Amino acid sequence: MNFIPQLLAAEKTNQSMLCVGLDPEPARFPAPWQGDARRIFDFCAAIVDATADQVIAFKPQIAYFAAHRAEDQLERLIAHIHQVAPQVPVILDAKRGDIGSTAQQYAVEAFERYRADALTLSPFMGFDSIEPYLQYDGKGLLLLCRTSNPGGSDLQAQRLAGPADRTPGAPGAPGELLFEHIARLAAGPWNRSGRLGLVVGATYPAEIARVRALAPTLPLLIPGVGAQGGDAQATVRAGWRGGTGQSSGQTSGQTSGQTSGQTSGQTTGPIIVSSSRAVLYASAAADFASAARAVASATRQALQAARAPG
């Protein structure tokens, strides 16, 4: 199944916007697995089995596996997810970004070796660094846009000078912020296949609303809820298709009379709200899987409840 239809099906079946991030740290595993990297698959598979009916997606972070020479366990884990929860897409969080020939190899890694359903990418090197991934029909690509870390502002919140004669509201127009430029490109000329999405941190709800206004039909992967401090209600209100935060479409360089014409009524893209540590390490005891399920269930319900205005 193609990534976006699969995502929408999981959202409907599980009534969920929650994505569980799989970031295994052996030092935090329960006894007797604590410190044993050979148990990465066992730990993550137990989390998957306990939460599969609570999520819209799973998101393994490749560095947490590669650091422990556990890439083979990552392969097994993704295969396990596809077996026990075939309706739930797997987003491989790798944030790849390189020139075309190297990107081709990263695409083989993600979609042939690991058989992920979607992949996170850095758009910094431009469209030709993304094209090789588009050769894989049905696979989703989620581009970094406004990330949850404080240092993201060093680049993503910088204003573009742009050509003085650029049409207002077009990508690269003077006064546009870099993250806005990325959102416009992803929603417009780069999205030829209809399989792009954007990554926007839960720690910046105003920016989520802005990105949603610029990209009303794209899926938004929103990390940062839970241990990173993102607020579930603010996140949903800003990004959900029925939310209240994406109504104006006004850029930071526009007046109140100049808008993009994109409103919440046109918003169809799902949101994928990711939580990792709060779920994975809800308990350090033998009940870690049931504790993870309890946290995932509570988070899912909080996200669903946040859809209601008021």
Task: Describe these PLM feature segments.
Residues V20, F58, D93, L119, ...:
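Conserved, mostly hydrophobic/aromatic
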Residues E11-T13, V48-Q54, I78-A85, P132-D137, ...:
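Acidic (Asp/Glu)-rich catalytic clusters
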Residues P26, A31, D98-V199, T217:
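Conserved anion-binding
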Residues A67-Q83, I99-A103, P123-G138, A202-R212, ...:
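Active-site-adjacent beta->alpha loops and helix N-cap segments on the catalytic face
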Residues T235-G242, Q266, P270, Y281-G310:
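C-terminal helical cap(s) of enzyme catalytic domains, especially alpha/beta-barrels
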Residues M1-P60, F65-Q87, R166, D287-F288, ...:
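Conserved N-terminal beta1-alpha1 strand-loop-helix module at the mouth
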Residues Q246-Q266:
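Long, intrinsically disordered low-complexity tandem-repeat segments
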Residues A202-G245, G265-V273:
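A C-terminal functional module that forms or caps the active site or interfaces directly
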